[in-house]
Each structure stands twice: as C-alpha cells, then as structure tokens.
C-alpha cells in the first residue's frame, strides 16, 4: 500500500475489525489453506489522510445518504421544513468553508460581503469573502506559505491558543482540509494588502496532488475565495441534487441572518435578509396558530453577543440556533440556557391562569416554544466535529443573556400561554373521560347509599328515573314513597348538600369530587358525548333525573346547581326532558277532615287573605322533607302527577338564564338581575300586589327560564340578605336574631353563650347550625382593637384578643355574656312598637330591622360577600357620629369623618376618596434598636410575628436576614416588639422607610359600601355622609312616629285613669249604683253616662288594625270595616277595680296618677321629634362615659394590683415587669410616609375614571354555602391587627379644619381660649349663628392645657320649658336662653398665668415634629398652683401614636386642645383627660357630645394614692414619691431600674446614658413637663368651687374610646 509523503502528516495505527479477520480466516479454511495471515497484514498503520478517507464518519459524519426532516430553502416555496435526502459528510465540508468565511468577520470588522456560488451542473462550489486576507508569507518553521499550510496540511489552524478568547467557529484544525480531502479539485485564492501579494494554489485527487503556488504582486482590497469540486463518488452521488442544493442554500440564508453587518450574495443575487429578526420571518411568515392568527414573534437583542426570538410552536419544542455562525441543529447548552429562563417565567403565568387543576411541568411548557438564538460564545466546544450540539458550560460562555421583564411579559402574551392552557384543558378532558365517564352496566358496585333501580342499565333503562334527594332524611322519605310506585323503575341517591358549580370549578375539583363522579357513574354519562338522538340516550342507565329537595331557598339552589351541571356538560339532555323535580307542600292547613296543601308561601298568604275565621284552621309548616311522615310520603307518591314537575326546554332564553345565574362572566348582569327583582318586589309591596309563585294547582311543567327568574333568584336574594347588613341597624339576620332574643329574655344575669345560642334558635326560628350562631354571639361581644367600637354584648370570659384576631376565643360552653347597658340606649324599647316584626312558622320573630339612635353600621363597620355584591365598611367613632347627628338636627351639614378603631394607637390618613392609609407605630430607640408599638388595624400580633419578623430574622434564599433579634413585650391588648439590627441596616431601612420595611402600613379601601336600605333594596353608597344622611332622614321620621305613638298611648292611659277616677268619685257621691244589677244593665248605664270602653285596649286594637290595613290594602271593604272591638264594649278596667279603690287614700292616689299622666301628655306634645332624639343621645353619651370609665377602672385594677386597705404604699408589683410592656420614653417616633401611597391611589382613581369597571368582590359560585364570615382582611388589608384594652393612653385624634384629613384629638373649630379672671364663656361672641358657636345641639367644648388636666365642667342638663306652645320662634328663643346659661356653667377654669390658646386649626396635618429634648413650655405652665401640680404625674406615658403629627406644635405653643365634655376618645367625664388618637385628625371634626351634667373636679387630696407608681405611670395615676414612668418621648429622666446589665433591653433606661435620680416630688420640673405628658394625657385645672352635688373621686385611665370591637359578628 502506497504511503503519502505529505509533510506533517502523522501515522495512524489501524486495527482491523475482528469480524473482517474472522471472515478471512473462514475463507482461508474454505480454500483448504492451512496458512494464517501474517502479523503485518493484520496490524496496519495508515497515514492521517488515508485514515480520513478510510473512516470519513469520524471526521465529517456519514457519507451514506440520509433521509430526514430538515429546514431547507426552495426557490418556489421559500424556507420550509420537509423530508430531504442528503449526505451529511458533503453538507459538512461545505459548511466548514462557509463558517470559515463567517469567522473572518470576527477577525476583521470591516468585512462586508460573502458570495456563495453553487453550480450543480458543473459540480463547482465557490465561497468568496472580503475582509482581511490570509497572510501571503512563508511560514518560517514549516517553510511553506501560510495559505498552503492551513489549507493543504492537516492539523494546522490559527485556533490552537486557548488562552485567547475567540468567538469563531473554527477550533480543531480540520475544517477546510477535510473539504480539500473530499474534493477532486480544491483551489484557494487569497490576497493580502498587508504583504502586497496574492496567492493561488490548487489541490487535486483528494489533496494528494498539488499544483505550484502562484504568487503575484497585489495592491487591491483583501479577499479570500475557495472553489472546490466535491468528490461525489466518495458520497455515492452522481451530481449535486435538488435536496443538497436546497440545504446549502438555507445555510447561505443562515449566514445572512447570523452575521451582523454582512451581505450575502447567492449565485450573484443578494439575499433579502437584513439581520436576525428578518431571518426569523423566513420561518414564521404565513404561519398561523390554532386560532387562525399569525404567529407573533418576540425579539430581544439582549446584548451584542445574544440575539433571541421567541414564538409559539405547535409541533413540540423547536429551536433554530447559531453559535459563532455554526448551525447547532441539535441545540446545546446555549439553547437550554435561554429556554430555561423563558420556561421558568411562563410556568408562573400558566399556574396562575390554570383553572383546570392539571399540574404543568417545565418540559410541557417547553413543548410549546419555538426559539431562535444567535450567539457568540468564547471558545465553544462541541460533542463532535460535525458541531451540531454545543457542550460548553454556561459559566464559560464569556457573556450572559439576561432577558428583560418586557420580553417575558410579551412572551406570556404571544399565544404560548394560551396554547399551553388549551393543551391543559384537553389533557384534563382526557383525564375526565378516562376516570369520570361511565358506560352502561346493569349493576353498579362501590357507590354507598345508592338504592339502584332494578331495571337500570337494562333494556328498560330509558324508563328509569333516578331520584336525587337532599340528604339521608329525604332519601328515607323517597324510599317510603317507593312502596307505592315500586322499585323497578326508580332509584334513589342522597346528595350530601350542595354540589359543585362545575361551570367555574377547576379540573382538580371535578376529578376529586366524589358526588359528581358518582352521579355520572350511576346515570352512565360520558364527557363530551352529545346526546342528540334516541340511540345515544340508550347508552344511559337512567332516562331521567328527579330532583327532590326541601322547599326552601337552599333547596332551590341545589336544583339550580344540578341543572347547571347537566347544562354545562350535556346541554342536549335538557332538550329531551331529562330533568324533573318532586315538590312537597311547604304549608298544610286542616280543619275537621278538610286538608289543604300549599307549595309556596305567597300562595298560602293569598289564601289567608280570603279565608274567614283563620283561627279555626290548624296550620303546619314543613321546613324540610324530614318533617313529612312516612304516611305523607306515600300520599305524595300516590299522587305523582301533582307532585312531579317537568322541566321543559323553551329555547335559547333558557340557556341564557342558566348561564346568567352561574357563569363568572355574568357578574354585572347578575347585579342588574337582582336589582330588577328587588325593585319589582318593592313595587309589589307598595301597591299591595301579591308576590309571584310558581307552583299553583295547575302547574305540571316549568321552563328553566321561569325557574331561574322566579325561584332561584329567591336564593340569590336570600344570600345577599344573609351576607350584607342593613343600613338601618347594621345587622345581618343572624345578629338581629341574637339581639331580639336578648331583648326578649332581658337577662339581668350573665348567661352561657352556648345556652343563649339555643335560646336564639328557639325564640327567633333560626334554621341553621348553632355553631355559626355561637360565633355570631362571640363576635358581637368582642372588644379588642379592630373588632367592635361598641360591643352590644358583654364579653365575660375569653372572647378573643388581638393576638390572634379573635380566633383564640374560648369554647362557647365556658364563656358568658349578657346585654351591654348601652344596648337599650342605642335601641330604645319604645321604638319596638314601631317596627315591623317578621313571622316564621307562624311565630313572631325579629323585626325587619331595628332602628338605633345612631347608625351602628358606621360604628362597628360591616363586611360581607353576597351574590353579585360585596360590602365593606370601616369603623367610625361613636361620639363623632353623635356630634354630626346633632349638627344635622341644627340644620348643618355633617363634618367629614375618617375611619376610627377604638384603642388603635396608630394613624389613619386619607389617600383619596374612600381610600385611607393605616399606619402602625415604630420608634428608633438607639442606633441598633427599633420599637414597634402598634400594628395596622387587623394585623394580628401573632400573624405579624410569624409572617413578617420571623422571615426578617431568618432570611430566605433570595433575601438575607434584615434583623438580628427581636423581643416581645406585648400583652393581649398592647403591642411591643423590640427589634435589634445592625447600625448599617437600620440606616438603610430608615432611608427606605421603616413603615414600609417592617410592613406597618396597609391601605383601607371603601369602594364597596353596599347596604340594604329601609325598603329592603340593595344600594351602593359613595360616601359615609350619604349613609349618615339617609339614616338621619329615616330616624327623624321614626321619632315623629314615636311621638305619635307615645301621645296616643299616654292619651289612652290618661283617659283610662280619668274614667276610673270619675267612676270612683261618682260612686262615692252616690251618682252610680252597681249593687244588685245585671251586667248588661251596668254596661248600658256606663255607656249612657259617657264612659268609654277600655281606652288602652281600644287604642292598641286600633293600632293593630291600622297595621293590618296597611299590609293588606287589597282586602274587601267588609273586612276593612270590621269594628276594632268586635266583642262589644269592655269595662273590665272599671268594674274589676277592688273595693280598696273606694278608700280616701286610693282615691287621692288615682287622682294624682291621672293628673301626672295628663302633664306627661302635655309635656310630650310640646316636644319636637328632634328634642326626643337629643334626649336619647345625651343619655347614651352619659352611659358611654360610665361604661368606658368602668373599663378603664377594670384595666387599672388588673394592672396595678389591689392596695392594702388603710395603707398608702404601693402594691407588690415588680417595677420592670410593668415598665417592659410600656414604650421606651427615649424613642424617636418615625412619621408614617404616605406620599407614594397617595400617588398610587391617584393613579388608580384616574384609571378608574377612564372607564375601568367597579372592582367589587363578589361571590360568583353558587356551590358554596353562605358561611357568614368572610376571610378577614380582604384585599386591602394584608395583615389584620387587633386592639388592646389599652394600657397606654389612647392615641389622640386631633381635630383639624375641613380640608385637612389627619385624625388627632378633637378640638373646637375656630374657638379661642379665655383667661380665668374674665369668667366668661370663651366661645361666646356676637356671631351666635356661626358654625363654631356652642349651640344646644353641639357639645360644650372645654379647652385643654397640654400639661394640665382640663377642668371639670358641669354637664348641661337639658331642660324643656313646656309652658309655651311649640312654635319655632319661641323654641329658638328658649334654646338661646338655655344656651347662655349653659355656656356660663360650663366655662373652663384656666390658670391665671395661661393667657393664650393656640387653636389646632393652624396645625399642618403632616406635622409630626417630635420633641425629644426639653419642652418649650412657657414658664406659666410650670408655675401652676398646687392643685394642678398634684395632677402632674397623671397620664405620664403616651401611646406611641401620641407624638402625632403636631405634638411638638402643641407643646411649643401651649396649645389647648378644646375637647368636648363628651370626649370622643374615651368619653371621659369632665375631669377626665381626653386622650389623643392619631387615627389622623378628622376633617373639621365637630366638638364632641353635649354633656348632661358637669361634675366637680376632685380635690387634690382625693387623688388615689394607693396605686403603685410604676403601674400609675402606665395609666396616668401619680405617686408623690416617684418620678413618673411614662411613654413620654422627651428628656425626662427616669429612675434607674436597678439593672446593671447594659446589654439587656431596659425600657426604663435611656440609651447610652445613666438615668439620673430625681428628688421625689409631686409636681414636675419645668423642663420635664412636655416630655412626661403626652398629647393624650394632659392634666387640667380643677373647676371653681360651685354649688351642686359633689362628684365622686375620679378614676384616671390611659385609654380613650370604649372597648370597641369591630363587628366580627357582622361577618355572620
């Protein structure tokens, strides 16, 4: 074998294949040759060139023809993927030369053109490129010219220096030489301007022959041209066929797309490709997705090395990728690198949108992606010389491809996600068909409680009916009835309540719903099968389904859900009369042997109106199927025609009706549907028309449209009634039933919650589970922060705390409750006579609504989700509402109000219309410590700890730990987290905003203020003022009705007493004789003498008659003209008097009662309805003061311990234990920043105004039973806080002029203080009509010194001068006179030294200046007389919210916050300090309530001194011998706590300094006044001595508003 003398070629040892040797041996044996092959023939060595030719697949791939799908470019079709037959080796040698040309672009950026020429006829291929040529110079080592070296000698390359980072395709030193070796002729032409020579040389016969190199002088532009004729015989080809040319053409297009800045000429024509994006269009143009829409390509040039395009693939994952211009047709790690990023983002989107419930894995997402990648990678590696799969690790790419969020967002909207979801839906359907479909079996096993029809699944299956019952008890009724009609054709299966709304259910829900799957299996249904013809119906086991549910609204809902189930999956079945229902009587009336059945309440009501002598009939209500006996069941089934109602399909309107009721897309239509229903019902009631009902005596069938619009709509309306409260009383029906029962029981002693629930169910006909009822009672009694502002029931026991948001309430078996003393003041008993009481089972139950004296729906808030609507209302301050009512009674507009949660110490600030920012409180104590002392409303302490602080402490994979430690010092009512963090992180957190970092801000949005109005219609209110005004008009009209009722009742009683007195006097005088006379004669005599039949009884009967006539305006004339006293005159009230009545004493007493009653009537007649209302408000506020005072006293007693009787010493309470729960006095308050939140709110509002639909949370699925208690925190509130029975003073709400919207301590508007010496009303001036003047409807407002408690002022007692007739002018004059007297009585007594009062009007709402050092208080303040000094230590700790937005302004200016006698914070009595509440000042908040009677301030010596000063500092009670321990933020130095451990947190120690001791004293130093007294608790000067009853000792508390609970019962 000849050896080539080619320089530089290495020998290769070739091992002969064993199979070849074996074959040669066998041949030798066959030839009877006993000689063996020589060793030399067995073991051979080949040159590298020989090896390449002998084993080409090692280098260029297979040289055998291969047929496969490839992207090619055909002249007539363009870029297309088709089956082609080609030789991979030939394709590869062409590609090597092409990639070399492209590589030159990386060496010379000036290269601009590549020319590719293919001549199939001549078998000539030429590739030309400009740019830097190959150096035409002799290689000094190899002694040959460089072009000859690199094209004509193996293992030569310019790419062997791996230290040099190159982004070229060449790597191994084989490429161009392989093309040379597999060509019959291979010519290289190049010109190098640098060396001023051109070079041309030709190799022939597989690089075995070489011509002489032609070198010429050259001074033109550099270029390189390779021309070769492939050795077709080596590739078993005769010519370059169409397929290989199409493939090579595509590679030319590849180069045009992947080489930036290079134009590619193909056979003399420029290819129409401009960049990579243009190249991608060759693949996707004219291609449509499954919906017929053109494919959308997402393109991003990530950087100069990465160009990525993405679109939808419908043929599994596809990729077209290039690495340094090499077509990596099998992909590689560069493709995975990009695709993994895309998949991870898309799968997040898919999971959010995936309602089917089928799990989606990354590879399934990848199957819908078509990606195009053009990248430059440094020194890439491949798994073979063919370079189809790039194997370099991403870390070695030399660059990163970071795709933008814009790219990912566009990718999620380009059709890929939709395609995935469609695939998921298809897969879900396949799974459903596999698991949930059924076939026709004669017997079914494995379904418990199924009583199968004997003929089901047989030849009579179409005649079989499956009865679906509501529960097991209904099944028993059906089985009893089957004794009449037989079991062959009827099967029974009980449902476990409401079935799934399959229209909106996920795939997972349907797959896992046993009930749905059981019905499918029993009936023999198959998903996606159309039951249009009779043949398909024969595949079913049952020909009909009969629905047998209770005749109530929940039963109607179950019917609707079953109709929806069949309609959604097999609509054609409805057209065949597949569904029917079995109805049972809801009421039976019987008399003697006559029995009437009624199938709807309206039908029964109509019958009652026309029947005489109703009492002769026995009425029985059937609330459920379980009420019927087995005997009645047999009667029902015996008369099957009467009780079976067929559902008849009437056309598209039926489809539309079912979709309307159950589709998520029909939310707005459902609102309109229910609104029209409520309006229709209201009009019917107004005109006395009967309500519509379905099941008359002649009803045999029913359309689906009628069922939805006349029966199912009752459930939807009922759902709203149970979920959404009434504007009038703020209650849902469950809450109203509880209150009704409590009023009726009128317990004077506490009762167990569990027992009360049973009583409610009995007295008010409650038809649901008692567990829900018990939770309603518990929620009505809760009073922690974030629950009720006024709890109508008393929480005697553990009713839940702010730690867990009420979920930590004890079992109802262990806790007690009873009515609050405020309940009957809010809901006066006399108003019960005006209410419309409802009847259930012929039993008188709760009224349609109660009518409180103030809108409870605002005080305790409301929340609920119904059908089509949702309701959300925050809490508001009771006193603020009282003040607004008083303003409205005076004809003034109500002041705007901000939400207010009792005992909440944070701030609530307005962001926009009905949008508020709720902020907790955080203080910076030192360089690495912050203190959190309040959380946003309804952010529960435990939840906050677990969801916010724990992740901050432990960190996550993505975010490092922010804090190093935290300690907890809170109680069940207060919050205190002491958080440690590094100085650097604290600085960073403060720069970012501590409230934001610690998640201490939430938003409260009130755009769903939907309530039932007094007519029972749902109405959406835009503002709280709208609610208040509508309530005001209704309540005022009811005060008029109350007055009418009282005048009538008192008049009747007066007449009765007058008749009794006259009768006694006439008997004594002998004018009347009754002895020995018949009853008839006596009655006739009394009538003749002008005595009236019992006036009280007659008046009551007249009232009842009037009510009946109002309810039944359409009755006959004869029934309406019946006498009010059909039994004749009633004189028992006279004739039944005892003989004792004839005595002188009794006669005088009777006459006195008569005269008193007459005066009462006259007095009442002189009062206006507004007078009655004012009296009720005054009584309520007075009792509210007492209740809150008692609450504070209870807290104080619990915190300070009991003092030993007779001793003044402090109780044994550890100082540090009390201090550690209190805020540090040295912290720097962080002002909540809401600028960004305001901007965001403005953007949302603007967007909404542009036409965005209302975003209301609605219940769209009817398959969930109403739970009554929506999840706490709904969209607007992330974490929900609760409230303490505050141990610290209540944050102060400061009043601002209208226009400012930050809640602070309420002050009078525009009123100035007066000096004590003048002894005149500081507010009295000539402008008595001005809005700021004190009027009888407005409370007396006492200015408050920022250091001293406000003086006790007497509460004005409202007195009505009834000596004059009721006339407007006279009344106004009286009011004015009374007012002047009231003003003088209530004048505040201020210190002589206090000359000026700075009203709060001028304070800026964002002013949160913090006074950390000495106060700027004027010397006059510190030099107050001894009386005021003795109050100095009171309320020495502020709540964290005290340093409110204008605290320092208040301190610096000696501002006296004018607070009403009925202070809205706590309702303190006149001597009680009005705590501040930074629930952000209410806009133009009016002065608080009017005060009934002012009381004298306690003398100094009567200060309670037995209470420990430590605990005093917590509640504001001073101890003479110690400095106060308070929440004050100033420089007041505290006594050292005794702890020597500097590292431990000590709330009593000032950071970085030792607390200096102060001498014991009872008054404050001037320097310390401001810091010790927060804006919440400032002492006030005592009132001047005056006559009147002495006031008992005052208990001072730190809390403001009463223990309020947000009505969590409102969620029931």
From Swiss-Prot:
The modification Phosphotyrosine is found at residues 1358, 1408, 1596. Residues 1098-1128, 1245-1586 are annotated as: Disordered. The modification Phosphoserine is found at residues 1224, 1324, 1328, 1330, 1332, 1346, 1363, 1376, 1387, 1400, 1411, 1428, 1439, 1441, 1448, 1453, 1460, 1509, 1511, 1513, 1537, 1539, 1563, 1568, 1600. Binds two Mg(2+) per subunit. The magnesium ions form salt bridges with both the protein and the DNA. Can also accept other divalent metal cations, such as Mn(2+) or Ca(2+). The active site is at residue 814. GO terms for biological process: axonogenesis; B cell differentiation; cellular response to ATP; cellular response to hydrogen peroxide; cellular senescence; DNA topological change; forebrain development; neuron migration. This is DNA topoisomerase 2-beta. The lineage of its organism: Eukaryota, Metazoa, Chordata, Craniata, Vertebrata.
